[in-house]
C-alpha cells in the first residue's frame, strides 16, 4: 500500500515537472520569436577557415540587429571624439595628450564599428585588398602623422595639416566601407548636379 502511494506521488511530481518545463519552454520560444532579430542570429566570423572560429563562446554570437546597434554606437562615439578634439584644438598647446587621445579613440572606434558589423577577419581582408589599400594606408598614416606632429614635433601647423588630411581619409573610409556608400555618394552627386542645373539659368 505504501509503495503504491509513493509510486503515484512520484508520477504526479514527474508530470507536474514536465508540464512546468514545457510551459516555460513554450513561453521562452514565444518571447524569442517575437523579437525583431530572432531570425537573423548569426555568428561573427573570427577565423579565415569559415566555420572554425578561435572563439566558441556565446559572447561572439551576435544577431544582425545587435551588430548594427553596436556599429551605430561606435560610429556616434567616433564622431563625438572627433568633434570634441576639434573643439579642444585651441588649447592644443596646453593639453596635447588629451587631443591625441580623443583623436585616436575616434579613429579606433570607427574601425571597430565596421569590424563588428562585417566581422573582424572579413573587415581585415577588405582593408588589405588592392582597391582599398590606398584608403587604408592614408587613414592610418595620417593618424600616425597627426599624433607625431602633436606629441613629438609639437607643431600646430603640421597638426592642422595632418588633421585635415586625416578627416578627409576618414570620409573616404566611410564611403568605401559603409554599406552602399559609393552608390549613395554617386546618387547624391547626381541629384545635387541636377538640382544645380535647374537653378542655373
Swiss-Prot record:
InterPro entries: Vesicle_transpt_Got1/SFT2, Vesicle_transpt_SFT2
Entry keyword annotation includes Protein transport: yes
Membrane spanning stretches: 69-89, 99-119, 133-153, 160-180
Keywords: Golgi apparatus, Membrane, Protein transport, Transmembrane, Transmembrane helix, Transport
Annotated compartments: Golgi apparatus membrane
Segments on the Cytoplasmic side according to the record's topology features: 1-68, 120-132, 181-201
Topological domains, Lumenal: 90-98, 154-159
UniProt keyword annotation of Oxidoreductase present: no
Top-rank lineage group of the source organism: Eukaryota
Biological process (GO), any one: intracellular protein transport
Topology term for the membrane: Multi-pass membrane protein
Gene Ontology cellular component list: cytosol; fungal-type vacuole membrane; Golgi apparatus; Golgi membrane
Pfam family, one: Got1
Similarity remark: Belongs to the SFT2 family.
Task performed by this protein: Nonessential protein required for the fusion of transport vesicles derived from the endocytic pathway with the Golgi complex. Can be replaced by got1.
Name used for this protein in its record: Protein transport protein sft2
